[in-house]
Each structure stands twice: as C-alpha cells, then as structure tokens.
Amino acid sequence: EQAGVELEIHWHSFELDPEAPPRQEISNSERLAQKYNRTIAEVEDMQRNIAEMAKAEGIEFNWENANSGNTFNAHRIVHLAQSKGLGSEAKEALFYSYMTQGLPIGERETLEDVASRIGLNPVEVDDVLDSDEFADFVKFDEQVAHEQLKVTGVPFFVFDQRVALAGAQPREVFLQVFEQTLNTADQATIEQSTDAPVCNDDQCDVPEK
C-alpha cells in the first residue's frame, strides 16, 4: 500500500531436504543439530529466537512440536492450489500446520486437512496424491532455482522476473526493491541482494536479538 503497487504472488518450489522421510522420528532440534553440526542447546536458542521474531509479527511458532518431514507432496498441493487461485492460501495453511500445530506436512492426512481448509476439491487432491501430477512442476522450479537463479537457500524472492532478493529482509528493504524494480523496467538481467539470513544445506542463519 505504501508503494502504491498491486502485487501478484506466485509460489515456486524449493526443497531444503529432498531425502527427508514423511515424518521425522527424532525431534526437530536433534535433526537440525545433526544437519548443521551444532549442539542441541545452540539449535534450541536459535529456534527460540525465531519464535520471538515470529511472535512480533503475530505468528505463533511452537518449535518444540515442529516436524520437518518431506515437503515434495506439499509442493505439489501448492501447485494444485495455484491452479485454482489459492496458492497463497495453501502456503499460509501449510505454514500454520507446521509452525503452530506441529503437524507433519509430509504426511497425507495433514495435506488432506490443509486442502480441505482452503476449499480444494478432495477428489482432485486425491488424484494428485495418488499420481505424479505436478511433480514435473516441482522439479522444473528446482531446476530453474539451482541452474539459472543459483538459489542455495530460503527465503528467496524474484520481482518481475528481473530483481532477486535473498534472505529474511525487513519490510523497508522490500519497499526499496519494489521501487528499484519499477525504475528499471527495461533491465533484462536479474540482480541479486543476498546480505540477509537464509537457511540452506549447510547452515541456517538467524539474526541476533
């Protein structure tokens, strides 16, 4: 609203852990400690910090119950939702299921619940989950991310297919990028700003409190 710009949001797929099982059998703290070679105490401090930042934005992050299972099918459901104009609703519902409810979003029951909450046709949802539908969409997104955009972590944003922004950025930075994008309409190449916390295969940065 401040920038006076009407936005259309399109979500793309990017898996941080493609080999993850549908449900983790160890706690999220244990999993992250193993993945990033940290102590459990360090990981728990990191997650408390994230929870505090989330709370400031009105988001309840119950990190103690989070279960980071495989997200491939969740990405497929998001693509189904986007085909119905419900992409952002699907993402919000998945974030809520994972962050607040502590549900394993790699499991079918959770995905069916999310789909029902946002009004997707249960028959179409079953058709997707019982097949490979939208699998090519997920793989194509990830191929573009890795090979063309050189994405290594999330979050990652692309504006007007020309200006890229990586990491957890304050709203002021987004407004600056909107302005930059509007003022460089004839620019064809993608420029990237990466000076912000990201999560990738090797680390997960969280700003200091």
Where do the PLM segments sit?
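Structural alpha/beta surface segment adjacent to cysteine/selenocysteine redox centers
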Residues: 1-98, 204-205
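C-terminal cap of thioredoxin/glutaredoxin-like
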Residues: 1-4, 78-209
